Amino acid sequence: KLIKEIKYEGLATIEFLVDFKKADFRFIECNARLQVEHTVTEAVLDLDLVKAQILIASGKTLKQLKLEQKDIVEPKGFAVQTRVNMEVIDSKGNTKPSGGKFSAFDLPSGPGVRADSYGYSGYQTNPSFDSLIAKIITHSSEDNFKQALKRNYRSLCELKIEGVTTNLDLLKNILSDKSFKNNNFHSQFLDQNIKTLLLKNNHTDLSDITRSIKKETLKRGKIEDLDPLAVLDHGKSGGGFVEDSENILKLENEELEEG
């Protein structure tokens, strides 16, 4: 109703404060753009909002894009986004941008994991731009908030950034906080718990393990043959790249009894 009233055409983000105990909400503001958290909406609704925004700007209607309210499905599962910033955090939680050159940079991946970033190993940061370097979005299609958190925490442990100071440890501490995992938090959660959340914790570093797995996967998938049809022989005797392994699944034709 608000968008129709102002005759707005395009994609906008409307923010509310929600009181779950009273099942009540209050309007905050309307932004005539995507918000950085749009990836959460995309995950739970299986939409590409950036694509939709461009198509609407080019003249397409919501009806043509099948994005009218009646076409929007119920949110599926939970999605969590963490924002990795290049910043230094003092004991009171105040932040200031950090900078430098990335000596190592490797993003997490896997089912239900999305990583948006412009970083790469060797990248020299620019203080003229925002300190946000990566967004890690994880989705659990099940109605399980803890699973989405667990997946995001693991992804942060797989993320490798060296050469600049980031808020990675703070993010890991938040996701592993007992109250937070039990969905018991509010808009003042960070302010009230900042001292505890800034303490050093021994989080498992999975970045080297993950990178080794990626390299091994690429190595095993390499087909050393100029024949463009060599891929059809991959894993077969006489093919361009063969390696005996108990992990190779062998399929054989076998007659089955009726029924």
Locations of regions flagged by a protein language model:
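ATP-dependent carboxylate activation and anion-phosphoryl transfer catalytic cores
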Residues: 1-246, 252-259
